[in-house]
């Protein structure tokens, strides 16, 4: 495999590719609850373009409630194709709720959302987005390699084998590909889940707390994979407590109690104030 990204075969959706350890590329409130303050605007209030491709992610009054308790206030959000976003906030701030609705795992209480112009939960939206959950889930009887093959073939990836080899080598799991990931430690499970998220093609990647449990090698591999995927044009949204990684993003969105409290340039953000009391991830 060539180390030049320009020589890599291009597909309609991004493929995270590596080269054997050295990658070549790879709201407002509603319902029974009292009204809330107006949603923060920031860049999400920018006028929509009348022409051109649809945004990678768009939400209109998207909200989630559990009974009368809001998990996410109605949210209007627009993320353009190719943006790299860091999503921060305390546990319970709404980050995971938002991501799960976007990938079709959680039914919104109200509002709408699209992925690459397609309604969330549709076949097209599911094909466009790769999701790494905060708690990876594996099949009990499949090895790491069998998981990779299943996911790659499910998404029509013909040349998945070399790609899979490169990914497992990069995260340091080459000697564990024939083992069941359900038996792994938290850190090894996270590494296995990373390979599975990147082995398939995608336009949009949503990752929830990916640094949890990773050692130095794993964190370096993750950052490199994200950089390469972004370089290939993928839209990335990374929910994280790893504040040192925020500087790699072009846009920062902070949530607190289900509302946006900041949306803008990470360099202009007061991270200490936005994340007061949040414990950063540790190995």
Q: What do these predicted ranges mean?
A:
Residues 239-241:
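H-loop/switch region of ABC-family ATPase nucleotide-binding domains
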Residues 111-125:
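Conserved ABC transporter NBD signature motif
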Residues 216-218:
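Helix N-cap at the start of a conserved alpha-helix in ABC-type nucleotide-binding domains
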Residues 205-209:
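Catalytic Walker B motif of ABC-type/P-loop ATPase nucleotide-binding domains
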Residues 88-90:
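The feature captures the beta-strand-to-loop junction immediately N-terminal to the Walker
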Residues 103:
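Helix-to-loop junction immediately C-terminal to a conserved catalytic motif
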Residues 149, 153-176:
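Conserved ABC ATPase "signature" region
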């Amino acid at each position: 495999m060539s180390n030049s990204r320009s020589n890599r075969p291009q597909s309609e959706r991004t493929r995270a590719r590596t080269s054997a350890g050295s990658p070549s590329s790879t709201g407002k409130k509603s319902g029974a609850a009292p009204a809330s303050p107006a949603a923060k605007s920031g860049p999400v209030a920018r006028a929509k373009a009348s022409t051109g491709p649809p945004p990678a992610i768009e939400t209109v009054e998207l909200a989630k409630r559990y009974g009368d308790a809001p998990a996410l206030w109605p949210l209007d959000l627009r993320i353009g194709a190719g943006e790299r976003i860091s999503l921060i906030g305390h546990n319970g701030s709404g980050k995971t709720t938002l991501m799960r609705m976007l990938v079709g795992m959680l039914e919104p209480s109200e509002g709408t959302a699209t992925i690459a112009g397609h309604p969330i939960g549709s076949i097209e939206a599911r094909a466009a987005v790769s999701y790494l959950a905060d708690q990876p889930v594996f099949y009990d009887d499949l090895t790491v390699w069998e998981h990779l093959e299943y996911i790659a073939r499910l998404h029509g990836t013909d040349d998945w084998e070399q790609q899979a080899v490169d990914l497992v080598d990069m995260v340091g799991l080459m000697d564990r590909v024939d083992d069941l990931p359900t038996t792994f430690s938290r850190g090894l499970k996270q590494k296995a889940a990373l390979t599975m998220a990147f082995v398939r093609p995608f336009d949009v990647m949503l990752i929830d707390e990916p640094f949890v449990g990773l050692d130095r090698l794993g964190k370096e591999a993750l950052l490199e994979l994200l950089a390469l995927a972004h370089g290939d044009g993928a839209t990335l949204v990374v929910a994280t407590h790893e504040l040192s990684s925020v500087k790699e993003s072009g846009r920062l969105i902070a949530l607190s109690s289900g509302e946006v409290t900041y949306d803008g340039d990470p360099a202009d953000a007061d991270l200490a104030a936005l994340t007061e009391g949040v414990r950063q991830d540790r190995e």
